[in-house]
Amino acid sequence: MTLFKHWQTLYINVNLATMTDGSESYGEISQGALAISAGKIAWLGKESDLPEHFSVTDEDIEVIDCKGQWLTPGLIDCHTHLVYGGNRANEFEMRLQGKSYQEIANAGGGIVSTVTATRRASEQELLASALPRLTALHQQGVTTVEIKSGYGLDTINEIKMLKVAGLLADELPVTIKRTFLGAHALPIEYKDNAEGYLDVVCEEMLPQVVSENLADAVDVFCEGIGFSLAQTKRVFDAAQSHDLPIKVHAEQLSNLGASELAANYNALSSDHIEFLDEAGIKAMKKSGMTAVLLPGAFYFLRETQLPPIELLRKHQVPMAVATDANPGTSPIHNIHLMLNMACTLFRLTPSEALAGITCYGAKALGLSESKGQLAVGYDADIALWNINQPAELCYQFGVNPLSRLIQNGQQVLMNESA
């Protein structure tokens, strides 16, 4: 029996894009209704199927007439680097003038410049600079964000970054998942001693991160310009010893087999994956991993190798989409632009792209049992959009159609102009 007397809020006259795992056409329910109780979705379906004897005039329930708008799950950005010091606009200009990556690095640019600026910044300075980036995503309907470390590259500053990521949750009603990315690059003081740096990552940084409960997962940048397969395995082993889930930056510039390696550890996701091959895809499917597509970096770096979308479809590997917001290769804080790029550059369908920032974004963070879908018992993180069909969220960007944003059942944003 549906105990509607315990409902706090009921949305009526609304179309639902439930985005349930494996659903087609957005999991649409037209002329629907959705009820919230204690921060969870308590009921959803056709408005005509509301429980018998229920009345929308019940004074104990807030009833919201959505006037035919669309409800989706709150959006999820499952791969970002939002916390960092400085910016690299000067390098952008240098690159457009024809300077090579090495020339920029020799001039003090590249990731070294971000590491230097991040180390110099205080927690409050990093918080102040990250907050507008997170605010931009939040105002676009994002309710869950993953934030990585990786610009400190020493124990004090990696810890500082993760603490700032946690503090952001006190500033905005957004769920923050933190990922330790100490193995992002070699700091200049270890430029000729990768194994020595990994000693610090695995034996000093990671135990402290765990002891202070600062991370939900561990990531590694496995690439020719990053860490080798053997070095990546070393970090994975350390993460596994601390019972932390694994993610990996993999197959962005070449195929080292990092996705296959990560699959052996039942990793959450493999991200970038432009050079992923079928063997890696099969391994990901077998272990239940998610493929995270990052079209912003593909665009900003003017890459030409497309991710193997057809093979991912063939083997039914879930595809998430994220901003990869970072100062060097994707200084983009617009989730709707990512939807459009996923469709136009990678040829995802709009329903695949939207699934990528809802149910499969949740899966990439290990949250598939609580977020990313409109389903009974799931967290009431939902977004109301003034659109005529869900594809509009992928079709256009620059105009924000968000009408209301609800986090854990509480309205946190309202845009009367939408």
From Swiss-Prot:
GO terms for molecular function: imidazolonepropionase activity; iron ion binding; zinc ion binding. One of its GO terms (cellular component) is cytoplasm. It catalyses: 4-imidazolone-5-propanoate + H2O = N-formimidoyl-L-glutamate. Signal peptide: none annotated. Its EC number is 3.5.2.7. SUPFAM superfamilies: Composite domain of metallo-dependent hydrolases (SSF51338), Metallo-dependent hydrolases (SSF51556). It is an enzyme of class 3 (hydrolase). Keywords: Cytoplasm, Histidine metabolism, Hydrolase, Iron, Metal-binding, Zinc. Its cofactor is Zn(2+); Fe(3+). One of its GO terms (biological process) is L-histidine catabolic process to glutamate and formamide. Gene3D superfamilies: Metal-dependent hydrolases, Urease, subunit C, domain 1. 4-imidazolone-5-propanoate binds at R88, Y151, H184, Q252, T329. HAMAP family: HutI (MF_00372). This is Imidazolonepropionase. It comes from Colwellia psychrerythraea (strain 34H / ATCC BAA-681) (Vibrio psychroerythus). The lineage of its organism: Bacteria, Pseudomonadati, Pseudomonadota, Gammaproteobacteria, Alteromonadales.
